[in-house]
């Protein structure tokens, strides 16, 4: 469900946008359309003064910097893909396999021995894909979450993101940032009837099945590993980004063990920390809205959604 953000946390002084449910621009008081917590965050003593809001220009500049800092991404010879059929708008929903060959012709699996890749892959078998099935989190799985977070925070890319967010008064310490990432991404919430059956990480990276359709599932590593096992059948693509190096972006149609994904977009060839960092940035800066970025001189938008039915900490939302 799309819900515009209903808080001024981190939004003070941002320009008026009709997309928003409530507003945080300087004139909202006289226009009587401020968010309820406007005074708390944006008043003289508020946490989010206008200098702490994240501007559109800063998002463009920081995303370019994170793109440059993705030292663990695939090199040109590391991956060969075979996109085959380009589906038109009238074809994406008809569940026809128009590509006889797999999407991935070759992946240099030495990539997967890099610490952030290895710790990421360990997380992928921790989930029940069906929504409505309670997730049982073992002590080992909690250790795997902590290990992944430690590894990504060792990268220059995630350090750059942390320093930026700390400068915007979002976090006072790296430990606070790490703890919030853990809750935001791995905290469980219910997509069904009260069972704690989902998390941001499971939805975005591992994928879920809801009402007979694939939901989420935006990660190239997960796609490659399942395709290699014969559990995923690539059908077609409806978008191929303008990038001629990795990461690239594809819009995909595929079947996962008989369940269909009509349009699934994915970065191809980026490191786990790049995706994790970029999505975290967008969720913190533009929750529930399009987050406009620039990668290698090409524009792209990422849409994140806050889970509005439950929260953690003092009203923070899961991704």
Regions found by a protein language model. Give the residues of each.
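Short linear interaction motifs
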Residues: 16, 294-301
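Generic detector of ordered secondary-structure context
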Residues: 26-30, 173, 270, 310-313
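Extended hydrophobic
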Residues: 300-319
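N-terminal "domain-start" segment
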Residues: 45-296
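Secreted, short cysteine-rich peptides and small extracellular cysteine-rich domains stabilized by multiple disulfide
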Residues: 2-44
């Amino acid at each position: 469900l799309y819900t515009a953000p209903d808080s001024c946390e981190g939004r003070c002084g941002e320009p008026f946008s009709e997309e928003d449910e409530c507003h945080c621009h300087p004139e909202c008081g006289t226009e009587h359309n401020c968010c309820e917590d406007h005074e708390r965050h944006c008043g003289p003593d508020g946490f989010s003064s206008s200098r702490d809001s994240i501007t559109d220009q800063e998002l463009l500049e920081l995303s370019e910097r994170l793109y440059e800092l993705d030292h663990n991404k695939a090199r040109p010879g590391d991956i060969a893909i075979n996109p085959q059929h380009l589906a038109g708008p009238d074809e994406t929903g008809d569940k026809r396999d128009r590509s006889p060959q797999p999407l991935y012709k070759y992946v240099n699996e030495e990539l997967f021995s890099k610490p952030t890749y290895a710790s990421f892959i360990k997380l992928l078998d921790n989930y029940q894909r069906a929504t409505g099935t309670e997730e049982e989190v073992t002590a080992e799985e909690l250790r795997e979450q902590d290990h992944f977070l430690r590894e990504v925070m060792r990268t220059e890319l995630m350090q750059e993101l942390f320093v930026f967010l700390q400068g915007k008064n979002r976090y006072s310490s790296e430990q606070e940032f790490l703890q919030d990432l853990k809750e935001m991404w791995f905290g469980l919430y219910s997509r069904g009837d009260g069972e704690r059956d989902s998390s941001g990480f499971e939805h975005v990276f591992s994928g879920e099945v809801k009402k007979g359709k694939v939901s989420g599932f935006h990660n190239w590593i997960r796609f490659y590993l399942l395709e290699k096992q014969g559990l995923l059948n690539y059908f077609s693509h409806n978008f191929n980004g303008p990038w001629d190096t990795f990461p690239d972006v594809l819009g995909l149609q595929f079947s996962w063990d008989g369940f269909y994904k009509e349009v699934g977009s994915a970065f191809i060839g980026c490191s786990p920390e790049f995706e994790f960092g970029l999505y975290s940035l967008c969720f913190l800066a533009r929750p529930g809205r399009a987050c406009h970025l620039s990668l290698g001189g090409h524009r792209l938008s990422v849409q994140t959604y806050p889970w509005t039915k439950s929260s953690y900490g003092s009203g923070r939302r899961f991704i």
